[in-house]
Amino acid sequence: MSSRVLTPDVVGIDALVHDHQTVLAKAEGGVVAVFANNAPAFYAVTPARLAELLALEEKLARPGSDVALDEQLYQEPQAAPVAVPMGKFAMYPDWQPDADFIRLAALWGVALREPVTTEELASFIAYWQAEGKVFHHVQWQQKLARSLQIGRASNGGLPKRDVNTVSEPDSQIPPGFRG
C-alpha cells in the first residue's frame, strides 16, 4: 500500500513514546509523521501548530463574502397552466401550444419528429412578442409548426452546432489522395 507523508520530519513510534516533548520541539513546522512497522501510523502536532491549523480551517469555512443570496433566486417558479384567450390575441410570454401539437402539425402538412424544445418555443415567443401581431391560437400554432419546419430543415435536420466547441480534424484520407 502506497502512502504520502506530508512532513519532512519522520520518527518511530518508540522514539515518540520515549520523549515526545523533545521530538516535537525539534520538528520543523510543529508536525512529525510517526511510523510504526515501517508504515505511517499518525501525525503528532504541537499545540501551537494545532491552533494555527484550526484557525485556518475556521477562516476557510467562513463565506468569502458578507452577501447572502436569497434562496428564491435559485428556484424557478412553477408554470401554472394559462387559459388560451378567445379570439385574436398578441403573443404573450406564457403561451404554450396544445398538448397534441405534433398531431395537429401533421394535419397542417408539417411533419415534426420531435416536440418543440423550450429554446425553440422561447425564440418563437420572443420574436412574435416584439412584432406585436394578433392571431388566433390555432394560427399561432400553425406559425410555430412552420417556424420549426424551416428552422430544423435549414441545417439538414441536424441540431445547430455549438460555436464554442473545438473541432477535431478528420484523420481519414479521401479516395484518390495520397497520405
From Swiss-Prot:
GO CC terms: primosome complex
Domain of life: Bacteria
InterPro entries per the UniProt record, alphabetical: DnaT, DnaT_DNA_bind
Keywords for this protein: DNA replication, DNA-binding, Primosome
Entry coiled-coil feature ranges: none
GO biological processes: DNA replication, synthesis of primer
The UniProt record lists the keyword Zinc: no
Region of interest: Disordered: 156-179
Family: Belongs to the DnaT family.
Subunit structure: Homooligomerizes. Interacts with PriB. Component of the replication restart primosome. Primosome assembly occurs via a 'hand-off' mechanism. PriA binds to replication forks, subsequently PriB then DnaT bind; DnaT then displaces ssDNA to generate the helicase loading substrate.
Function: Involved in the restart of stalled replication forks, which reloads the replicative helicase on sites other than the origin of replication. Can function in multiple replication restart pathways. Displaces ssDNA from a PriB-ssDNA complex. Probably forms a spiral filament on ssDNA.
Protein name per its UniProtKB record: Replication restart protein DnaT
Organism in which the protein naturally occurs: Shigella dysenteriae serotype 1 (strain Sd197)
Gene: dnaT
